[in-house]
């Protein structure tokens, strides 16, 4: 029978000092036999996805205390990728994932907490907390802040839905008037919550649901809706039950590594492919799998991508649907239901509620459930009122979207595409693979060949795109922007957005060893591995080289002979200490980022730290 970890600091005469300090936090004698549960919050006023979380930790804590636990809250950092985008701030985004994971480990282990409730929401916060949860392997429940309502505005006598990416594109489009650009900017992000499309934050919150570590509805129920409060209340109660099951009944099924098993990781990736999620989820799932000591690799993702269809299409791949529409159609469970009926899921998995997949679908799939309360929850909709307050409205759709032929979520028979929303490509400069979000690629350019225009920084590429130096048919290559080379593996949302602004979104490709925002669409291929800074062949590409992209056949090829590539590699190695570094880039890199770069692996390993360099 495992002993409460917290007993280390609450029991025994030699822990009198620790108990004295616990008493100073408000604990009493009666508390010293109870489980201490960390409420891991990420409130910050910097990030719209987190600005409403200040009081939600207290909400969870009250339920923990009422159920017989002791709640202790702390905060992690949270970087807003959208605000950090397009300047040096983006160098810090991905490294912040490791800092978040480490800080959770530090706090929980230093104070011997028994379990956690993780209150996350945005791009690197959910993955960082997920990595920490699987590393620590103590009972955990995730409950995120929820998606933002979609922006809406009237243009050309039509009400259209908007999001952050629209503001970026229109702001850079010389054909758009100042007044229209201003109108879109003011309308794009109307409420608190994670950006309204199937971008990285919402993708990851959907995946925690598929992994079984959060409750049904977590990935899609709006931040502003009153129904979301129940998820927080339930999380506080349920974590005490899970904690007691493990420590008092020796039930290891309550542990995250037994919930988020390899079968669950496969289900999560299947969901990701079916819903056309962000390519960043590949990075984060690979990283989380390593923390869980699960053998889940790019090869597994490649196999799944070849058999899973696209059953859901959401912004940025279409402006018709946002997360509020996914929720109306049944949310994550609605997509999982269609995948299950198609025979594409592992059914022998459980979630934090203790339900198997068939039980979860029976109770929460809008196509199966007889529970009116569940149907009512999935009718929770937007209010269209600007606010930064959680749970501030209770508007509902008149009906559910259960049209599996033409609605937001489709059945296998009516799939948007028999090919899934993500694909892994391999070739002679991506020997370990690269990732493309096929959900956002126009059918006309699934096969594409063009001459390379090579840039060694995102900034130079943006300048060239806006300066008219990139033309139809070009393949823009941005290298030395990987985890080590950037360092920090910047997102390339501005280059892809500006290609659209310049009318090149369907006639150009962009390839990088960096990554893309979840808001990216178009022929945008990232995570090229090995990266240039690690000696990857992307560092050998020269202006004018032809590059052939073949998504249907999962290929990407630099049309240069092996002999020529060998000669280029020899010349590169002859640069000595300067080999595999940018030739014409000046970038100030802090000590903190250099420390990150010294241990970073390429994207095919999840951009995690290389444990072999630490002797582990």
From Swiss-Prot:
InterPro entries tied to this protein: Dihydro-acid_dehy_C (IPR042096), DihydroxyA_deHydtase (IPR004404), DiOHA_6PGluconate_deHydtase_CS (IPR020558), ILV_EDD_C (IPR056740), ILV_EDD_N (IPR000581), IlvD/EDD_N (IPR037237)
Record flagged with keyword Metal-binding: yes
Stored Gene3D superfamilies: IlvD/EDD C-terminal domain-like
Keyword vocabulary terms for this entry: 2Fe-2S, Amino-acid biosynthesis, Branched-chain amino acid biosynthesis, Iron, Iron-sulfur, Lyase, Magnesium, Metal-binding
Annotated positions of the N6-carboxylysine modification: 124
Catalysed reaction equations from the record: (2R)-2,3-dihydroxy-3-methylbutanoate = 3-methyl-2-oxobutanoate + H2O; (2R,3R)-2,3-dihydroxy-3-methylpentanoate = (S)-3-methyl-2-oxopentanoate + H2O
Binding site for Mg(2+): 81, 123-124, 491
PANTHER family assigned: D-XYLONATE DEHYDRATASE, D-XYLONATE DEHYDRATASE YAGF-RELATED
HAMAP family referenced in this protein's UniProt entry, alphabetically: IlvD
Subunit structure: Homodimer.
Protein name: Dihydroxy-acid dehydratase
Gene: ilvD
């Amino acid at each position: 029978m495992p002993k409460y970890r917290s007993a280390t600091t609450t029991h025994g005469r030699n822990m009198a000092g620790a108990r004295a300090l616990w008493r100073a936090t408000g604990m009493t004698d009666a508390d010293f036999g109870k489980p201490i549960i960390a409420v891991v919050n990420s409130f910050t006023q910097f990030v719209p996805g987190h600005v409403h979380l200040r009081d939600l930790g207290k909400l969870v804590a009250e339920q923990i205390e009422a159920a017989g636990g002791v709640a202790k809250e702390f905060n992690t950092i949270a970087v807003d990728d959208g605000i950090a985008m397009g300047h040096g701030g983006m160098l810090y985004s991905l490294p912040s994932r490791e800092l978040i994971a480490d800080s959770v480990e530090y706090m929980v282990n230093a104070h011997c907490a028994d379990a956690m409730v993780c209150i996350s929401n945005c791009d690197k916060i959910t993955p960082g907390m997920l990595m920490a949860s699987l590393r620590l392997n103590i009972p955990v429940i995730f409950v995120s802040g929820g998606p933002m309502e979609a922006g809406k505005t009237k243009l050309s006598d039509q009400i259209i839905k908007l999001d952050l990416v629209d503001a970026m594109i229109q702001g850079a489009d010389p054909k758009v008037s100042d007044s229209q650009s201003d109108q879109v900017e003011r309308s794009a992000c109307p409420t608190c919550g994670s950006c309204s499309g199937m971008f990285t934050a919402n993708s990851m919150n959907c995946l925690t649901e598929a992994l079984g570590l959060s409750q049904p509805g977590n990935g899609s129920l709006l931040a502003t809706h009153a129904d979301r409060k129940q998820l927080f209340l339930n999380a506080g109660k349920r974590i005490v039950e899970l904690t007691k099951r493990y420590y008092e009944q020796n039930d290891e099924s309550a542990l995250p590594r037994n919930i988020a098993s390899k079968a669950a990781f496969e289900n999560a990736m299947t969901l990701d492919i079916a819903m056309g999620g962000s390519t960043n989820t590949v990075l984060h799932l690979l990283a989380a799998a390593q923390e869980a000591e699960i053998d889940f690799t790019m090869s597994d993702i490649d196999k799944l991508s070849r058999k899973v269809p696209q059953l859901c299409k959401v912004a940025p791949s279409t402006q018709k649907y946002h997360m509020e529409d996914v929720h109306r159609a049944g949310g994550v469970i609605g997509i999982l239901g269609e995948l299950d009926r198609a025979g594409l899921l592992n059914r022998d998995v459980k979630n934090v509620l203790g339900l198997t997949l068939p039980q979860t679908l029976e109770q929460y799939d809008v196509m199966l459930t007889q529970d009116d309360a569940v149907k009512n929850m999935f009718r929770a909709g937007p209010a269209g009122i600007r606010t930064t307050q959680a749970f501030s409205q209770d508007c509902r759709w008149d009906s559910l979207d259960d049209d599996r032929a033409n609605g937001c979520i489709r059945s296998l028979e009516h799939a948007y595409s028999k090919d899934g929303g993500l694909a892994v490509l391999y070739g002679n400069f991506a020997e370990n693979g690269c990732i493309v979000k096929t959900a956002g690629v126009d059918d006309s350019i699934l096969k594409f060949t063009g001459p390379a225009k090579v840039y060694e920084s995102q900034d130079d590429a943006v300048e060239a795109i806006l300066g008219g130096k990139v033309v139809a048919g070009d393949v823009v290559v941005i290298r030395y922007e990987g985890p080590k080379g950037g360092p920090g593996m910047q997102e390339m949302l501005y280059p892809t957005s500006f290609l659209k602004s310049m009318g090149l979104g369907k006639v150009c490709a962009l390839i990088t060893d960096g990554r893309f925002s979840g808001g990216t669409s178009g022929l945008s291929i990232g995570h090229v591995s090995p990266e240039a800074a690690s000696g990857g062949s992307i560092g050998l590409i020269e202006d004018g080289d032809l590059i052939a992209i073949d998504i249907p056949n999962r290929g990407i090829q630099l049309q240069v002979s092996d002999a020529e590539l060998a000669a280029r590699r020899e010349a590169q190695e002859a640069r000595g200490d300067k080999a595999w570094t940018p030739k014409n880039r000046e970038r100030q890199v802090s000590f903190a980022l250099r420390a990150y770069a010294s241990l970073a692996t390429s994207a095919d390993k999840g951009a995690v730290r290389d444990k072999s360099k630490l002797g582990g």
